């Protein structure tokens, strides 16, 4: 399906390109002159990429079906129709993959691959028009009275996009609820999630002007509260979490000490409980506070959220960085990490006020060199969090095994801390960490220190291109290596987590299955 050139979304072979286990996606080598930057230049050249000379039309289903060849390929995404013909040779998934979208509504196909891709920006010069909506029988008699839609200057505003179908809700008793109360100087909102909350938290709060958006990330489900507040409040939100009882309390300070008669006006999707994958991404502007070298080509970024925002990123979830490169929005997911693997005894940072991201800089990339060159104090749009990992997979696990390659280590970092802090039933956790050279190992000294402090934790480093002085394991992942690593003691419950470049992940998953681990005992981290 529609994808983006490999340098930016993300770099070829990075762990962010991994599909679910068993659903590998073929990549093709792009011809010279067909990178993302080349595509951006083409869209800025003034060349007619739609074949309509700037006209925007309304497209019927029958008309869409006619455009189903490589040289004449239209597709519909969220109600908007695009001509993909010019993009064929720029698509890293290849022509065959892109042709799956030819002549049809490809929204679901697109969402299967990378729903976070900003196709509106990438394909804005390929916009043919809007999909004609078939009136329902009940409305048929009234169509003559409706005003025709003007298509000049057509874009894809959120109001035109069909709302995704929500998944069946869990039993009513499990649906979160909220309440609120006030004092002379504060307004307090209490959310009862009706489940235990992990130590990492689950609340994402954004106060922008008078609008308050509160999202609870509860496993695969998202609970959203959204108001235009009755009166002004100060631009700071206190978030307190009672983890064991599943309660989250927000405290807002009133700008004027007066009694509120109501909390505010409900906004779009207020008090909804749907699957996370069906919830649209919400972006906020963050400030780059610091960049720290982790290795020769990897940096740890610290981003500060706006004063009115708090983000508790659940373990295994990623956020999206968005910035403009030559006038085109470029977006890429990154797994949130902690500031360090071993937490300091005291920290001055307020929980949820900062985000830390570990980013490998690809010299030929589009986004990562741009980020690496940003000055301290620069702004970056951050969306999410999002991801499929839930703590349910850790239930009753006694042996946790992690197979990571390169920056595929990032989701493992917080998983290790979570397991050590919150899951005493886990008797053993082992990380096998694959890299090319010793200088590529992320947080090597911290991993070694953790091994000495925590008898439950063990790390084995494997290098494919080691120096002669290297005394550790050598080579690439294979069956013999895993057979000795993935022990299955009597009366144990095991979980194997995998993350890394696509080739590594596919090999690891295949080898783990050959060792008779079930699908329930295997989790692949993916974007």
UniProtKB/Swiss-Prot annotation:
<feature type="domain" description="FAD-binding FR-type">
    <location>
        <begin position="281"/>
        <end position="392"/>
    </location>
</feature>
<feature type="binding site">
    <location>
        <begin position="399"/>
        <end position="431"/>
    </location>
    <ligand>
        <name>FAD</name>
    </ligand>
</feature>
<feature type="binding site" description="axial binding residue">
    <location>
        <position position="114"/>
    </location>
    <ligand>
        <name>heme</name>
    </ligand>
</feature>
<keyword id="KW-0560">Oxidoreductase</keyword>
<keyword id="KW-0408">Iron</keyword>
<feature type="binding site">
    <location>
        <begin position="372"/>
        <end position="387"/>
    </location>
    <ligand>
        <name>FAD</name>
    </ligand>
</feature>
<dbReference type="GO" id="GO:0004128">
    <property type="term" value="F:cytochrome-b5 reductase activity, acting on NAD(P)H"/>
</dbReference>
<dbReference type="Pfam" id="PF00970">
    <property type="entry name" value="FAD_binding_6"/>
</dbReference>
<protein>
    <recommendedName>
        <fullName>Cytochrome b5 reductase 4</fullName>
        <ecNumber>1.6.2.2</ecNumber>
    </recommendedName>
</protein>
<keyword id="KW-0285">Flavoprotein</keyword>
<dbReference type="InterPro" id="IPR008978">
    <property type="entry name" value="HSP20-like_chaperone"/>
</dbReference>
<feature type="domain" description="CS">
    <location>
        <begin position="173"/>
        <end position="264"/>
    </location>
</feature>
<keyword id="KW-0256">Endoplasmic reticulum</keyword>
<keyword id="KW-0520">NAD</keyword>
<dbReference type="InterPro" id="IPR007052">
    <property type="entry name" value="CS_dom"/>
</dbReference>
<dbReference type="InterPro" id="IPR018506">
    <property type="entry name" value="Cyt_B5_heme-BS"/>
</dbReference>
<dbReference type="InterPro" id="IPR039261">
    <property type="entry name" value="FNR_nucleotide-bd"/>
</dbReference>
<feature type="domain" description="Cytochrome b5 heme-binding">
    <location>
        <begin position="56"/>
        <end position="132"/>
    </location>
</feature>
<dbReference type="InterPro" id="IPR017927">
    <property type="entry name" value="FAD-bd_FR_type"/>
</dbReference>
<dbReference type="GO" id="GO:0005737">
    <property type="term" value="C:cytoplasm"/>
</dbReference>
<dbReference type="GO" id="GO:0005783">
    <property type="term" value="C:endoplasmic reticulum"/>
</dbReference>
<feature type="region of interest" description="Disordered">
    <location>
        <begin position="138"/>
        <end position="171"/>
    </location>
</feature>
<dbReference type="InterPro" id="IPR001433">
    <property type="entry name" value="OxRdtase_FAD/NAD-bd"/>
</dbReference>
<feature type="region of interest" description="Disordered">
    <location>
        <begin position="1"/>
        <end position="24"/>
    </location>
</feature>
<dbReference type="InterPro" id="IPR017938">
    <property type="entry name" value="Riboflavin_synthase-like_b-brl"/>
</dbReference>
<dbReference type="InterPro" id="IPR001199">
    <property type="entry name" value="Cyt_B5-like_heme/steroid-bd"/>
</dbReference>
<feature type="binding site" description="axial binding residue">
    <location>
        <position position="91"/>
    </location>
    <ligand>
        <name>heme</name>
    </ligand>
</feature>
<dbReference type="InterPro" id="IPR036400">
    <property type="entry name" value="Cyt_B5-like_heme/steroid_sf"/>
</dbReference>
<dbReference type="GO" id="GO:0020037">
    <property type="term" value="F:heme binding"/>
</dbReference>
<dbReference type="Pfam" id="PF00175">
    <property type="entry name" value="NAD_binding_1"/>
</dbReference>
<comment type="similarity">
    <text>Belongs to the flavoprotein pyridine nucleotide cytochrome reductase family.</text>
</comment>
<dbReference type="GO" id="GO:0006801">
    <property type="term" value="P:superoxide metabolic process"/>
</dbReference>
<dbReference type="InterPro" id="IPR037908">
    <property type="entry name" value="p23_NCB5OR"/>
</dbReference>
<keyword id="KW-0274">FAD</keyword>
<dbReference type="InterPro" id="IPR051872">
    <property type="entry name" value="Cytochrome_b5/Flavoprotein_Rdt"/>
</dbReference>
<dbReference type="Pfam" id="PF00173">
    <property type="entry name" value="Cyt-b5"/>
</dbReference>
<keyword id="KW-0479">Metal-binding</keyword>
<comment type="function">
    <text>NADH-cytochrome b5 reductase involved in endoplasmic reticulum stress response pathway.</text>
</comment>
<dbReference type="GO" id="GO:0046872">
    <property type="term" value="F:metal ion binding"/>
</dbReference>
<keyword id="KW-0349">Heme</keyword>
<dbReference type="InterPro" id="IPR008333">
    <property type="entry name" value="Cbr1-like_FAD-bd_dom"/>
</dbReference>
């Amino acid at each position: 399906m529609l994808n983006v050139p490999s340098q930016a979304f993300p770099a070829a072979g990075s762990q962010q390109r991994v599909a679910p286990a068993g659903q590998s996606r073929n990549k093709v080598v792009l011809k010279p002159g067909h990178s993302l930057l080349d595509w951006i230049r083409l869209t800025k050249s003034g060349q007619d990429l739609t074949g309509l000379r700037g006209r925007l039309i309304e497209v019927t289903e029958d008309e869409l079906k006619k455009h189903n060849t490589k040289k004449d390929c239209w597709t519909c995404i969220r109600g908007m129709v695009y001509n993909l013909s010019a993009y064929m040779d720029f698509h890293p998934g290849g022509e065959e993959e892109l042709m799956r979208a030819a002549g049809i509504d490809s929204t679901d196909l697109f969402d299967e691959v990378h729903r976070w891709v900003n196709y509106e920006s990438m394909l804005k010069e390929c916009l043919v028009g809007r999909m004609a909506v078939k009136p329902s029988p009940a409305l048929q008699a009234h169509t003559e009275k409706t005003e025709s839609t003007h298509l000049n200057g057509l874009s894809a505003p959120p109001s035109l996009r069909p709302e995704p179908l929500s998944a069946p809700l869990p039993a009513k008793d499990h649906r979160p609820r909220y309440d609120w109360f006030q004092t002379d100087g504060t307004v307090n909102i209490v959310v009862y999630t009706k489940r235990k909350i992990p130590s990492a938290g689950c609340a994402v709060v954004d106060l922008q002007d008078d609008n308050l958006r509160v999202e609870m990330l509860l496993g695969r489900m998202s609970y959203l509260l959204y108001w235009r507040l009755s009166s002004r409040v100060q631009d700071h939100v206190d978030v307190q979490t009672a983890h064991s009882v599943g309660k989250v309390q927000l405290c807002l300070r009133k700008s004027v000490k007066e009694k509120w008669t109501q909390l505010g006006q409900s906004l779009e999707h207020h008090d909804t409980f749907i699957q996370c994958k069906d919830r649209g991404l919400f972006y906020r502007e963050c400030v780059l506070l610091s960049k720290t070298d982790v290795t020769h080509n990897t940096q740890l970024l610290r981003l500060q959220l706006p004063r009115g925002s708090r983000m508790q990123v659940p373990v295994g979830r990623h956020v999206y960085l968005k910035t403009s490169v030559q006038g085109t929005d470029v977006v890429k997911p990154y797994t949130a990490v902690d500031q360090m693997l071993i937490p300091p005894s005291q920290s001055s940072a307020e929980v949820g006020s900062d985000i830390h991201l570990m980013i490998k800089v690809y010299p030929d990339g589009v986004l990562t060199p741009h980020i690496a060159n940003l000055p301290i104090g620069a702004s970056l749009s951050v969306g999410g969090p999002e991801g499929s990992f839930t703590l349910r997979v850790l239930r009753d696990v006694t042996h946790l095994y992690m197979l990571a390659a390169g920056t595929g280590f990032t989701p493992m970092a917080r998983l290790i801390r979570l397991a050590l802090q919150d899951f005493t039933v886990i008797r053993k956790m082992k990380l096998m960490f694959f890299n090319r050279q010793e200088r590529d190992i992320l947080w090597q000294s911290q991993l070694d220190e953790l091994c000495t402090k925590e008898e439950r934790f063990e790390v084995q480093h494997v290098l494919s291109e080691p120096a002669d002085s290297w005394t550790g394991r050598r080579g690439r992942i294979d069956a013999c290596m895993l057979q000795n690593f993935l022990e299955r003691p009597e009366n144990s419950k095991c979980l194997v987590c995998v993350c890394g470049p696509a080739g590594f992940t596919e090999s690891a998953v295949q080898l783990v299955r050959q060792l008779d681990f079930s699908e329930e005992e295997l989790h692949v981290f993916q974007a």
